[in-house]
């Protein structure tokens, strides 16, 4: 069961400490809030606002995706799958902390600072480019006392689009998304877009191109 507690968050100014030589610009909301494209080249606008709903485990999501998220979880649980939201909305500061910790971990393994940054960015989104900062992406894990990870991930991959969610980083689209396969990371795009992305076997970047 998810519970509601709303609050308004205004993002602070974004920094780009791990940008390197990547050309970037602020993400466009031209196609609507649900289709805003955030990746290594598209930063979250500094004035982006999100109204949050708190889940029963303390994680938060954009209030606009809450009904479909609850509906999807109800459907999965009705079929015997145990699952929960491991990660939801993150602040700029929380994303920066994750990056710092990953870099430090690689440095502790003997990697140089530049090597550690490069490796960390393969696993952790550069602050300002994480969909978790939008509040419309969730990391969903299996309750392994009830279901295996593979069973939950398979169910999500086959059914999430029905509720407006997509597997954001498929294994066969890494060259486009710039992110390795993440079977737990689901992003809300709305039912129409999710169905098109699923049926065509494309990723969000490719779908956005069809709208241009």
Describe the function of each predicted region:
Residues 1-212:
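Extracytoplasmic cell-surface/polysaccharide-interacting catalytic and binding patches
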């Amino acid at each position: 069961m998810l519970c509601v507690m709303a609050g308004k968050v205004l993002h602070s100014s974004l920094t780009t400490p791990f940008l390197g030589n990547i050309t970037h610009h602020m993400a466009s909301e031209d196609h609507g809030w649900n289709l805003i494209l955030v990746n290594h080249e598209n930063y979250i606008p500094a004035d982006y606002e999100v109204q949050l709903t708190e889940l029963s485990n303390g994680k938060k999501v954009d209030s606009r995706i809450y009904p479909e998220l609850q509906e999807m979880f109800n459907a999965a649980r009705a079929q015997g799958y145990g699952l929960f939201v491991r990660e939801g909305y993150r602040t700029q500061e929380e994303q920066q902390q994750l990056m710092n910790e990953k870099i430090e971990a690689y440095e502790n393994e003997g990697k140089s600072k530049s090597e550690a940054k490069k490796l960390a960015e393969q696993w952790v989104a550069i602050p300002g480019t994480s969909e978790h900062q939008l509040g419309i992406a969730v990391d969903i894990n299996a309750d392994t006392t009830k279901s295996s990870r593979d069973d939950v991930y398979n169910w999500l991959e086959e059914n999430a689009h029905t509720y407006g969610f997509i597997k954001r980083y498929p294994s066969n689209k890494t060259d486009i998304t710039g992110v390795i396969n993440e079977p737990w990371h689901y992003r809300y795009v709305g039912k129409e877009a999710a169905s098109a992305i699923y049926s065509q076997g494309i990723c969000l970047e490719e779908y956005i191109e069809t709208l241009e």
